[in-house]
Amino acid sequence: MSRKESRKDKHRDETETIADWLKEHRVGEVECVVPDMAGIPRGKILPTTKFLSGLRQGTLRLPESIFGQMVTGVDAETEMLTYQAPDLIMAPVASTIRIVPWYKDPTAQVICDCVNFDGTPSEVAPREILKRVLKLYEERGWKPVVAPELEFYLAAKNLDPDYPLQPPAGKTGRPQTGRQAYGIDAVNEFDPLFEDVYDFCEAQDIGIDSLIHEEGVAQVEMNFNHGDPLAIADQTFLFKRTVRQAALRHDIYATFMAKPYEAEPGSAMHIHQSVVDAVTGENLFATRSGKDTKLFLAHIAGLQKHLPAAMPLIAPFVNSYRRLVRFLSAPINTHWGHENRTVGLRVPISDAKNRRIENRVPGADANPYLAIAASLACGYLGMVQELAPTKAMEGNAYESSRYQLPRHILDATAKFRASSDLKELFGEKFVALYSDVKSSEHDAYQQVISPWERQHLLLNV
């Protein structure tokens, strides 16, 4: 059987699986969602009959230009996409179809891959970029495992973007006025909201476990169960939308912006990652006696060497770099260490089976597909290049001036654009297009006059 025939058979099987599911759940509308470069859900909402007709005839389409959009929704300046570029076909992934739990009428959502008319995957779709990295691991007989920890803030509704955010009022009717790290009652202030979050996640098979109050005012963290990176990225993508929708039901905002409050810590998406043997499931990061392996150390070394160039994928906006400052629970370099929360790469104490690395650099604002792809790609490069890490940091990494991360999106984008290793892994078209999007976003940001400038420059200079 040819590859083309195999793709047709798979498409036919997935189509009938989806059709049966929609009939069983009596779905009236379907949301076809595609994560763009920023992780924003884009796509189409269709009546079920129209959706199935389009699925069978291959007429569910989106312009490739959605991947050239900035977070503002405006097209970036780029030569990677032309005005005559054909549409991409949306290919719904049957395993991701779910009922949207916050709608009154039965409505489904399904994550879609984007493929060319010849059936080949898009070169620039973020979900395909992650699949590309996972294929490299598969070819080596390795299987990565990840578990994100995702932080976010709750905020009172704010209709004026020039006005600073304020913490929301909870059950007591009073906003939080101080930090309550790990505070049980502080979390319970928003019990009705989190009950909705858990219910919505359960309805969508989003595997979250613990909930804690983080260091910031009205800042919380929810952790995901560990699992397959693509499935976890799908869940994280849906989770961010779910939390925002749950918060709106309670008349407040939930934000995954990296640094929404000036005087508070930023929000991260720490990624715990390990690699197991694809056949035996044995953790390749530790021997059975618990000793670190060469592959484990090489994975760390790859993160140390290549993360600075991959920064636009894990710290994608100007605001992202406001989070990466000293003494506010965020890293500023790629030092690594055991149980050291001042480093970028922390190794938690564990037995051999659970040996892993916690990448503390990614922000909550990152596209989960691209953040996980970047983190795994850097570790992969270390493994295949047989790199050796620095000595583990035993002191305060904030006091070190070595192995610094880029301090600004322009610097990070320049490193990303110039990295031959990342171009080979992700593809030249993706690296160029993503870099153009980041550069255009910065140009748009530079057009805005900030309140700080008006306050301090208007009458003083």
Predicted regions and their residues:
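ATP/Mg2+-dependent ligation/transfer catalytic cores
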Residues: 1-208, 232, 401-461
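Catalytic-core signal marking the mid-to-C-terminal active-site face
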Residues: 2-5, 18, 238, 245-246, ...
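Short glycine/proline-enriched loop/turn "hinge" motifs that connect secondary-structure elements
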Residues: 99-106, 144, 211-215, 264, ...
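Short, hydrophobic beta-strand segments
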Residues: 110-116, 220-226, 273, 359
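Core alpha/beta catalytic barrel or barrel-like domain that forms the active/cofactor pocket
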Residues: 145-153, 169-184, 204-223, 254-270, ...
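Short beta-strand elements
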Residues: 163-172, 269-277, 334-336, 343-349
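Accessory "access/gating" subregions that flank catalytic or transport cores
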Residues: 181, 186-190, 194-208, 222-229, ...
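Active-site neighborhood of thiol-dependent amide/isopeptide-bond enzymes
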Residues: 226-238, 261-262
